[in-house]
Swiss-Prot record:
Reactions listed under catalytic activity: Couples ATP hydrolysis with the unwinding of duplex DNA by translocating in the 3'-5' direction; ATP + H2O = ADP + phosphate + H(+)
The encoding gene: hel308
UniProt-recorded name of the protein: ATP-dependent DNA helicase Hel308
Organismal lineage: Archaea, Thermoproteota, Thermoprotei, Sulfolobales, Sulfolobaceae
Entry function: DNA-dependent ATPase and 3'-5' DNA helicase that may be involved in repair of stalled replication forks.
Example GO BP: DNA repair
EC primary class: isomerase
Length: 705
C-alpha cells in the first residue's frame, strides 16, 4: 500500500504541525489504511491491530477531523483509569487549535455538568455509562465516540458495560472502535455497522519462541522461525534474562501471581552484579521510592533493595505512587527488569526488548482449586509488549513450559491459532438485568417496544434475549426498581437512586433485604454485609486465616454462614474486608494493617475506595426506604471510611489539608473542631509548622464562616 506522509494528509495545516512536532513524518501501514478507508471523512471503523501500531494517532485524526468539519463533541472511552490520564496528557496538544480537553472518571453519583464546556472528553466505560444513567444533557452533543481497548468486551467483568456503551454510541454518532487483534472482526464490524482495518503490522518485528529445560544440558528455546538458542544456568528465566541484558535489552517477566512476581524479582536481583547498570540513577530512583506517601514501609524497603540492583516487581497490590515511579524508570531504561502480573499487559504502554511468559496456567476465579490455560488473547497482550520502537530491531516473546512434551501444544495454541472471538457477556442475569435498568434510566421512560429494540441491538443471540428479557422486567418490577405507566416503563424512586449510585441491582436488593430485618448491627456486621454483595471487593484468605477471622468476631453478623464452598469463600473474604475496614476507621497504622492482613498498599486503597462507594450507596438505600435505624450509622461509617478516623475526628477532617494523622495530633492537644483551630492559630502553627499551619487556619475559618 502506498504510504501517506503527514504533509499529504487532507487536514488543516495546524493539525499537520502538531503531528510533525512529535517527530512523525509519515503514517505507518495501519494508519494509512485507516485514512484510505475514511477515517478523516467520519466513517465508522473497527481498527484491530497489535499493540504499539499507532491507534492513538488514528483516534486523534478521527476526532479532530470531525470537530473541525462538523463541530459537536468527541469522547474517548477507555477501560482503565490509568489510560485516561495518559490519553488526556496526549490530547492536550489539541488545545493549540482552540479545543478544550477534559477528563473524568470515578464519582458515579453526578452528571458532571462542567463538561458541557469541553470539546474532547476522556473517560472510562463505567463513567460514561453512569453519565447516561443520569441523563446528562451535554451528552446529547457527543457525536463522535472512540471506544478504546474494545476487546475488553470479551472480559467477564467489564464486557457488559463495554457492550452497553457501544449499543448506545452506535445509535448516537460515529464510532471508532480500537482493539487488539480479535478472532471475529468481520462479525463485530457488521454489528457496529463499521468497515474494518485489520492488520498484524508491528513497528518492531516480533520473534516468538517456547523455552523448556533439559536438566543439566541447559535450556532450549525453539523459535517460530525454526531457529534455536541454548542457554546455561540453573533457572531458565534468569538465564534468558541475563542473556538479553548482556545484549543491552530490557526484560518484562510475566508471572501468574503477585507472590511469583516478587520472588522472581528477588532471584533475578541476585545476579545483577553481572550487568552494566547506572548505579547513580538507580539510587536516585530508589530514594524516590522511599518518599512515596501512599505506600507501606515494608514494600518500600523491599523495592528499594531491588531497584538499586536494576530490578522491580509490579502488580495491583502496589500503590499508584510506587507503580508510577517504576514505570517511568523502566521507560527511561534505568530499571532493566520488571517482573509483573498480567495486569501490566492490559495497562499503560511499557515495551521491552523481551517478554517472558513464565506461566501459561492460572487459577480459575470461579472454580476453587481448578487451573486453566491463559487465552490466546492474553498471550497476545503480553507478547505485544516485546520490542521497543527506536531501541530494538526486533522484540522477543518467550513462553516457558514445564517440559518438552508441552511444546507442540503451546506453539499450536499461542503462536499458530487465531485469537478467540469476541462474544457478548450479557448472557447472565446479573449483567443483563443491570443493562436493562440502565437503559430505562437513561431514557427517563421508555416503551416496551423501544426497550426491546435496544436490547435486540446487542451481540447477544435472539434466543438469549428472549430468555432473559421477560425475566428482567419481572424481577425489576417485583423488586420495585421499575413500574409500568400506560405501556411505558419508568424507574421508581428506589430504582432511580440505585441507578444513579451505579449499584448493581442485586447489590441493592441484598442490602435492602438484610437491612430490613437487622436491628442494631455492629460496624463489622455492616461492613460484612456490604462487602458480601456482588459489587464488594474480593481478597484472598489463607486457610490459616479463616478460623482466626471467625474466632476474632465479637458481634453477630447479619448474614448466616453458607454451606456452599464457593459462597463460603466469598463470605470469609467479605469478613476479612470488614476487619480491614474496622481497623482502618479505628486509626490503626497503615503499615500494621498491611502486615496484619498480608495485603499491599494498592489493595488497601482499592478496598477503601470500593467500600466508601458501597457504604455511601447503602446509606442512600436505607434513607430512601426510611430505614432510619440504619441511615445515620451508615452516613457516619461512610465518612469515617473516607478519612480512616474514629467518629471524634470527623469535625477536624472536614478541614482541607487535615488527614487522619494531623487530626489525631490536633485532637490530642485539645484542638477538636474547626472553631478551635481558628481560636488557637499559634498553637496550630507550632504543631503543624508555620506555612502549613497558616493554610489550615485559613481553611478552617472558611468552613465556619
Amino acid at each position: 500500500m502506498e504510504e501517506i506522509t503527514v504533509e499529504d494528509l487532507p487536514v488543516d495545516s495546524k493539525v499537520k504541525d502538531i503531528i510533525k512536532s512529535r517527530g512523525i513524518k509519515k503514517l505507518n501501514p495501519p494508519q494509512t489504511e485507516a485514512v484510505k478507508k475514511g477515517l478523516i471523512e467520519d466513517k465508522r471503523l473497527l481498527i484491530t491491530t497489535p499493540t504499539a501500531s499507532g491507534k492513538t494517532l488514528m483516534a486523534e485524526l478521527g476526532m479532530i477531523s470531525h470537530l473541525l468539519n462538523k463541530g459537536g463533541k468527541a469522547i474517548y472511552v477507555t477501560p482503565l483509569r490509568a489510560l485516561t490520564s495518559e490519553k488526556y496528557s496526549t490530547f492536550k496538544d489539541w488545545e493549540k487549535l482552540g479545543f478544550k480537553v477534559g477528563v473524568t472518571s470515578g464519582d458515579y453519583d453526578t452528571d458532571d455538568p462542567w463538561l458541557r464546556n469541553f470539546d474532547i472528553i476522556v473517560t472510562t466505560y463505567e463513567k460514561l455509562d453512569s453519565l447516561w444513567r443520569h441523563s446528562a444533557e451535554w451528552l446529547k452533543d457527543i457525536d463522535y465516540f472512540v471506544l478504546d481497548e474494545f476487546h475488553y468486551m470479551n472480559d467477564g467483568d467489564r464486557g457488559p458495560v463495554v457492550e452497553g456503551v457501544a449499543v448506545r454510541a452506535k445509535r448516537q454518532g460515529t464510532i471508532l472502535a480500537l482493539s487488539a487483534t480479535i478472532g471475529n472482526a468481520k462479525d463485530v464490524a457488521k454489528w457496529l455497522n463499521a468497515d474494518i482495518v485489520a492488520t498484524n503490522w508491528r513497528p518492531v518485528p516480533l520473534k516468538e519462541g517456547v523455552m523448556y529445560s533439559e536438566g543439566k544440558k541447559g535450556h532450549i528455546i525453539l523459535y517460530s522461525d525454526g531457529t534455536t538458542n541454548k542457554l546455561k544456568g540453573d533457572d531458565p528465566i534468569i538465564a534468558y534474562t541475563l542473556d538479553i541484558l548482556s545484549k543491552g535489552g530490557q526484560v518484562i517477566v510475566f508471572r501468574s501471581s503477585r507472590k511469583y512476581a516478587e520472588t522472581t524479582a528477588m532471584k533475578i536481583s541476585q545476579y545483577m552484579n553481572f550487568v552494566k547498570l547506572d548505579d547513580k540513577k538507580l539510587l536516585e530512583t530508589a530514594e524516590r521510592i522511599k518518599e512515596v506517601e501512599d505506600a507501606g514501609s515494608n514494600e518500600k524497603e523491599v523495592l528499594y533493595n531491588l531497584i538499586v540492583r536494576g530490578v522491580a516487581f509490579h502488580h495491583a497490590g502496589l500503590s499508584k505512587g510506587l507503580r508510577d515511579i517504576i514505570e517511568a524508570s523502566f521507560r527511561e531504561r534505568i530499571i532493566k527488569v520488571i517482573t509483573a502480573t498480567p495486569t501490566l499487559a492490559a495497562g499503560v504502554n511499557l515495551p521491552a526488548r523481551a517478554v517472558v511468559i513464565g506461566d501459561i496456567y492460572r487459577f480459575n476465579r470461579k472454580i476453587v482449586g481448578f487451573t486453566e490455560m491463559i487465552s490466546t488473547m492474553e498471550y497476545r497482550q503480553m507478547s505485544g509488549r516485546a520490542g521497543r520502537p527506536g531501541y530494538d530491531n526486533h522484540g522477543e516473546a518467550i513462553i516457558l513450559v514445564r517440559s518438552k512434551v508441552e511444546v507442540d501444544k503451546v506453539i499450536d495454541k499461542y503462536l499458530h491459532s487465531d485469537i478467540e472471538p469476541i462474544e457478548s457477556k450479557l448472557g447472565a442475569e446479573g449483567p443483563f438485568f443491570s443493562f436493562v435498568l440502565s437503559l430505562i434510566a437513561s431514557e427517563g421512560e421508555i416503551t416496551e417496544d423501544r426497550l426491546k429494540d435496544y436490547v435486540e441491538d446487542t451481540m447477544l443471540s435472539k434466543q438469549l434475549v428472549r430468555k432473559y428479557y421477560n425475566n428482567a422486567i419481572d424481577w425489576l418490577s417485583k423488586n420495585e426498581f421499575i413500574k409500568s405507566n400506560d405501556d411505558r416503563l419508568q424507574l421508581t424512586k428506589f430504582g432511580r437512586r440505585v441507578s444513579d449510585l451505579y449499584l448493581n441491582p442485586f447489590t441493592a436488593v441484598t442490602i435492602k433485604n438484610y437491612l430490613e430485618r437487622a436491628e442494631s448491627p455492629c460496624d463489622i456486621a455492616y461492613f460484612h454485609l456490604i462487602a458480601y454483595t456482588p459489587d464488594g471487593p474480593l481478597v484472598s484468605v489463607g486457610r490459616n486465616e479463616e478460623d482466626a477471622l471467625l474466632d476474632n468476631l465479637d458481634c453477630e453478623l447479619i448474614i448466616d454462614e453458607p454451606d456452599d464452598e464457593l459462597e463460603f469463600s466469598n463470605y470469609i473474604s467479605a469478613l476479612k474486608v470488614a476487619f480491614i475496614l474496622k481497623d482502618w476507621i479505628e486509626e490503626v497504622d497503615e503499615d500494621t494493617i498491611l502486615s496484619k492482613y498480608g495485603i499491599g498498599s494498592g489493595d488497601l486503597r482499592a478496598i477503601i475506595d470500593t467500600m466508601e462507594w458501597l457504604t455511601y450507596g447503602a446509606f442512600h438505600v436505607s434513607s430512601i426506604l426510611d430505614l432510619n435505624q440504619h441511615t445515620s450509622v451508615l452516613e457516619k461509617l461512610h465518612k469515617r471510611i473516607a478519612d480512616g478516623v474514629k467518629e471524634e475526628l470527623l469535625e477536624l477532617v472536614r478541614v482541607p489539608g487535615i488527614g487522619r494523622a494531623r487530626a489525631r495530633l490536633l485532637f490530642n492537644q485539645g484542638i477538636k473542631r474547626p472553631e478551635d483551630i481558628v481560636m488557637k492559630p499559634e498553637r496550630v502553627k507550632s504543631l503543624l509548622g508555620q506555612n502549613l499551619g497558616e493554610k489550615i487556619v485559613k481553611e478552617a475559618a472558611r468552613i465556619i464562616a
